[in-house]
Amino acid sequence: MAEEAADVDIDIEGDINESSKSIYDSLNTGFAPEHYIESAWQNEEGLAPWALDSSISEENREAIKKMLLEEEYYLSNKPLAVKFWSDSQEGEKQCIKRVRSPAKASSSPVKWTKEEKNLFEQGLATFGRRWTSIARLIGSRSVLQVKNYARHYFKNKCKLEGFVKEEAKIGSLQIPNLQDYENEPDITDEPTTFRGRADPNLNAIKIEKLSDDEEIDITDEVDELLSNKTNLDTIIIAKTDKVKETKVETEVQQKSHSTTEHSQTDIPKLVLQQTETECLDSVNPLTCITSPKWTLSPQQCEEDDYDQPDVQDCLQEKCLSPHAEDLTVLCENENDSQDEDDEIKPPDQELEIDRNFILDEEKQAIPEFFEGRQAKTPDRYLRIRNYILDQWENCKPKYLNKTSVRPGLKNCGDVNCIGRIHTYLELIGAINFGCEQAIYNRPRPVDKTKCKEGKDTLEAYKLAHRLQSMRTRKRRVRDPWGNWCDAKDLEGQTYEHLSAEELARRHEDKIKSYKYSKGTRQVRSSFDPFQLIPCSAFSEEKKAPFQVKVSCEAMLVLDLHAHVSMAEVIGLLGGRYTESESVVEICAVEPCNSLSTGLQCEMDPVSQTQASEALASRGYSVIGWYHSHPAFDPNPSIRDIDTQAKYQNYFSRGGAKFLGMIISPYNRRNPHPQSQVACLIISDELSNDGSYRIPYKFEIEYMQGEPQWELVFAKTRWIIEKYRSSHSSVSMDKRFRHDSELTCLQKLLMCMKKTLGNTACPLITEEFLHRIEEYFRTSYKKESNYQIEDNDPCKQHSDTTFTMDSFQDYEPNGRPSL
């Protein structure tokens, strides 16, 4: 029933100046009208508020009635009839007595025992406000329970001390009825009884279900002590001459000062507080009686029997009204608290610390090293502190920052604890004394109830509080491989526990592998992507996937293009693939412009597109690419393998084949004048070290049939015009090798004759070669750098930039000399 009304806000307004006859006699409940004050909840016609709205269901009406009567019972402090509990559930009865967690109940007793209280006070004196350490010392209480108990401990301590102070001054006078202040302008000396009057702030009722995982002790030993001395129905007030007539106004507001609302079980004990201000009306729903000297603050008299873990600490220092000033009773008078310095006083002189001893102030300021932790010990604190002091002695009078001391404090803890020690030493004047960079900031606000411990203790407490409030970083750990990672990443992993022998063996293996890797790293420094990889041959175990045939026209253009440049040349292969016969025919070659960087040769995208269109116009498909190795073996480099593999995989998606051809015209290891040609594909097999895929070379067959002569002449003219003025152009009239009498042009003609030997008529072949030779001689005469001497082929010109002799020691594109 109570759960259905849990989220219902009930606003009941009444006139506190009028009262009606009680109608509690007609209700079937344990509450009787003679138990309570005259109710302000009834209207002039004597109707109860739950009877005003006919739309309220019977169950909700009963719930509202029960809640209001229970609240009236709380405020009146009258004994409850026994029969009232007969109609109630046991769970509801327990909710009145205590707040029980819906998840689980605490195994420890609800009320704090004397032993626990003594341990709490002992831990408070030893650790300060480190609730985790105090909870560990007590053992039977959680950190949350210790924190809640501490909140009420300090609050009740202030109340008790303030009450004892005022009790000696003001005697045992009783407060007159609050309602009488409306009719009587003066306060008389005669004692009158203060009947229970509902706090107007309670007119707005909100019932919530607490969800704290603990049982909370709602008995307060301080209140029990006060109840033995004075009647809870009365309160002591000082004798004064006159009190200004104050109109008591009631304003119903709902304010959420915490996630859990206060419930009151006794009459509020109004705390007397000396102040010079007057309560502000109509701003906060507080009923205030103001005199020139004394102010009654009902908000300070709320019951402390309910723990509120989510209430902000500022509620302990300020009244619930944001406009009321200094309404908390402090153990230090106002003048002292207002005269506090905004900053910690800079030290007057440099402090000398004994390197072999730890002061009590240090233990209080940096307690983490003195709590018995395995990672943080007093010896480690001494090491860090003394190292910082030594560094200060070395760099004095220059400012010693935190970063400069960290390199010498490896494996001494995280940077945050080192920074806290550095900050502490700086604040007490042990380091950075007299430096302008030293900052003495005001620490965070602290609980002023510790003021009586002495001014020095308070300063030490402030310092410790500031050090503990420094931002901490996320803790990082190393994974099993020694890499830094977040601690959460290692959650749920299983760790292998090894013996000492196994650890030693693995350590040796690790050292060996490390040495091996260092040795191989020096070898791999010369292992660049231009290293040549020999091609493997197909065998019976690994047969060729298809046959490769090359036309005469393709070989003629390929030789022409490769012979004219010392740099690598590049182009596309055109032809067709016959799947039924598993034959790839290379029928045409399209030279392309290259983008050479000196280390590699790449195909110009525009030229590549034009070459593809030219092949397509002749009815051929792109079935591969070619490039030259001018003066070294026609083996692919690692980069060539990677490029070929990418193209190969791309074309294979459509079922096409893609070959790679490498031609070497001036390889000095080749004893024959004919160019070396390699036609290859890349397999899926990896090398022993896994750095590349193994290339395989095909056996080339030459196709029968005459080439298109005019097309070959057109390609020749394009090649000569492009490369004759190039800085990498080959001087065609020079010997291509020291041990040969052949010039580069003669070598080219010999290669072309070899290609045409079995396919064309000898007369036609001779005519074709003669025209090619004449065209080369005529074209190169136009260039002053390439003058031809027909009579003396062995004579060399000193102004020639590139000759074939330079190939003996030069490897293009940065390739190693083989």
From Swiss-Prot:
Domain SANT residues, every copy: 107-158
UniProt short sequence motif JAMM motif, positions renumbered to this chain: 627-640
Binding-site residues, Zn(2+): 627, 629, 640
SMART domains assigned to the protein according to its UniProt record, in alphabetical order: JAB_MPN (SM00232), SANT (SM00717)
Enzyme type, top EC level: hydrolase
Motif placement: LXXLL motif: 745-749
EC nos: 3.4.19.-
Hydrolase in keyword set: yes
Protein name, as recorded: Histone H2A deubiquitinase MYSM1
